[in-house]
Amino acid sequence: MDETLKDLAAHVTGALPGAVVAHKIAYGELTLETTPDHILKLATFLRDDPSCLFTCIVDVCGADYPAREQRFEVVYHLLSLKQNARVRVKLSAGEETLVPSVTGIWPGANWFEREAYDLYGILFTGHPELRRLLTDYGFDGHPLRKDFPLTGFVEVRYDDELKRVVYEPVRLAQEFRNFDFLSPWEGVEYILPGDEKASSQPGAPAAPKAS
């Protein structure tokens, strides 16, 4: 399998000089790294070339790395039924980078790109309807960014008096708790009714004495 993927990587990089900035093979899958300027050319080639025929787009997702100059990664997962192969295409983008939409190549990418826009704020130019998909109308921010607060900015509830959904600033009923996850977990020491015989087993807690 790896030899087939190596041949595929060599074929793509040779046919599109400059479009693939890096590639690697891991866990039986080929990853191609490109740029926003070359994504449409590379995507079209991967779909149409007889040695590729990646006609199925499985997913388009985002990832956030705030420490990087280009904080976002856009990842395309492709499947070729003809070649029985998968390929992953990655590109990096900043908060204001316009990433060309691949909906004209794979119409199934429509909602995938909307999800990436909704959750990360990645901008896809040329998308037929780039609007939020999972969050509510008027939602503030993008919840899968690493700098998005865990509690969000507002909470949504149904108001019985107003008979409608209302938005209010987040009010925590209690402070966050700090858990010591490095401490060993200790189980309960009581014996459930019917488990009295278990106390005779080595290492089992003693049965409680009758009062």
Curated annotation (Swiss-Prot):
Keyword Cell membrane: yes
UniProt-recorded Gene Ontology molecular function terms: NADH dehydrogenase (ubiquinone) activity; NADH:ubiquinone reductase (non-electrogenic) activity; quinone binding
Top EC class, one word: translocase
Gene Ontology cellular component annotations, sorted alphabetically: plasma membrane
Domain of life: Bacteria
Major localization listed first in the record, in broad terms: membrane
Pfam families named in the record: Complex1_30kDa (PF00329)
Location of this chain's protein in the cell: Cell inner membrane
Function: NDH-1 shuttles electrons from NADH, via FMN and iron-sulfur (Fe-S) centers, to quinones in the respiratory chain. The immediate electron acceptor for the enzyme in this species is believed to be ubiquinone. Couples the redox reaction to proton translocation (for every two electrons transferred, four hydrogen ions are translocated across the cytoplasmic membrane), and thus conserves the redox energy in a proton gradient.
The protein's name in its UniProt record: NADH-quinone oxidoreductase subunit C
Species of the source: Azorhizobium caulinodans (strain ATCC 43989 / DSM 5975 / JCM 20966 / LMG 6465 / NBRC 14845 / NCIMB 13405 / ORS 571)
